[in-house]
UniProtKB/Swiss-Prot annotation:
SUPFAM superfamilies: Ribosomal protein S5 domain 2-like (SSF54211). It catalyses: Endonucleolytic cleavage of RNA, removing 5'-extranucleotides from tRNA precursor. RNaseP catalyzes the removal of the 5'-leader sequence from pre-tRNA to produce the mature 5'-terminus. It can also cleave other RNA substrates such as 4.5S RNA. The protein component plays an auxiliary but essential role in vivo by binding to the 5'-leader sequence and broadening the substrate specificity of the ribozyme. This is Ribonuclease P protein component. Keywords: Endonuclease, Hydrolase, Nuclease, RNA-binding, tRNA processing. Its EC number is 3.1.26.5. Belongs to the RnpA family. It comes from Streptomyces bikiniensis. One of its GO terms (molecular function) is 3'-tRNA processing endoribonuclease activity. GO terms for cellular component: ribonuclease P complex. GO terms for biological process: tRNA 5'-leader removal. The keyword Hydrolase applies. Consists of a catalytic RNA component (M1 or rnpB) and a protein subunit.
Length: 123
């Protein structure tokens, strides 16, 4: 389960991540990443948490399939939060093929997209 402080909820936060962040597309999903502030934090001030949100449209499938895809993506992102810069906003948008994909395929696409966004991969 994704902890409460790591959930992206407000429309403005989703819009910021999608419009001002970097994007990496894969066959099953698209990941938008808006990196956190680059300014060093004052002593005693903790870094803001990385927050993630998910977009799974009706094109992915019916309600049961959409919720299953969201649960899988939440679990995958939760395991990868420590690899993301503090204060980042992440939006994972599932594409229609995600409804037919298994956990391993979603994990592979998510890892490839995050690696590309964090500077470790090529197109």
């Amino acid at each position: 389960m994704l902890p409460t402080e790591n959930r992206l909820r407000r429309r403005e936060d989703f819009a910021t991540a999608v419009r001002r962040g970097r994007r990496a597309g894969r066959p099953l999903l698209v990941v938008h990443l808006r990196s956190g502030a680059t300014d060093p934090h004052a002593p005693g001030e903790s870094a803001p948490p990385t927050r993630a949100g998910f977009v799974v449209s009706k094109a992915v499938g019916g309600a049961v399939v959409r919720n299953q895809v969201k649960r899988r993506l939440r679990h995958l992102v939760c395991d990868r939060l420590s690899a993301l810069p503090p204060g980042s906003l992440v939006v994972v948008r599932a594409l229609p093929g995600a409804g037919d994909a298994d956990h391993a395929q979603l994990a592979r696409d998510l890892d490839a997209a995050l690696q590309r966004l964090l500077g470790g991969g090529t197109r």
